[in-house]
Amino acid sequence: MLHFSGSLTRLVGELKKLPGVGEKSAQRLAFHLLKHPSNIEALAQSLLQVGERVHLCSVCFAITEDDPCWICSGERDSGTICVVEEPQDLLALERSRAFSGRYHVLQGALSPLNGVTPKDLRIAELMQRLQGGEVREVLIATNFTVEGEATALYLTRLIKPLSIKVTRLAHGIPVGSDLEYVDAATVQRAVEGRSEL
């Protein structure tokens, strides 16, 4: 940022570190904050509070201010654990209201090319949770990417010997979409995963 103050240049530099925020977007955000100075203090306070108060649940590794989180300390079905990659995935499932069990957040997915191994994820903690005998089913809800599929396969191989039912989220054609616009792999999975009516 040529000819701007050092403070503004630093702000733009910090904003650019956020995912999906490039130079232009960072400048736009910085100038918006300058136009509305009352927002600066509120934003700064929110950022500080998140840094001080928000942490990972010691049971499921979701983001929380309380430990254990409200899901782990609530009246949810403790016999079913849904494994997700990131806390955002847990929120998506909760919005659907389709799952009433508990969660386990891996904090990522296996990615040998990026140096992410099982030791980098919360897999050991998941396996420890499964030792108690209370869990009947593990629903693997990793993303349908190469990394997510590899993680699902790896987890299945670890969990199956424990005589715990392992299921995977169904995937197929999104509601409201036309078949002609759906990729071949999605159509294939939808056909293979068809159910009887």
UniProtKB/Swiss-Prot annotation:
Superkingdom as given in the UniProt entry: Bacteria
ZnF (C4-type) ranges: 57-72
SUPFAM superfamilies per UniProt: Recombination protein RecR
Gene Ontology MF terms in the entry: DNA binding; zinc ion binding
Pfam family, one: RecR_C
GO BP term, example: DNA recombination
Keywords: DNA damage, DNA recombination, DNA repair, Metal-binding, Zinc, Zinc-finger
InterPro entries from the UniProt entry: DNA_Rcmb_RecR, Hlx-hairpin-Hlx_DNA-bd_motif, Rcmb_RecR, Rcmb_RecR_Znf, TOPRIM_dom, TOPRIM_RecR
Domain Toprim: 79-174
Family: Belongs to the RecR family.
Function: May play a role in DNA repair. It seems to be involved in an RecBC-independent recombinational process of DNA repair. It may act with RecF and RecO.
Protein name listed in UniProt: Recombination protein RecR
Lineage, highest ranks first: Bacteria, Pseudomonadati, Thermodesulfobacteriota, Desulfuromonadia, Geobacterales
Encoding gene per record: recR
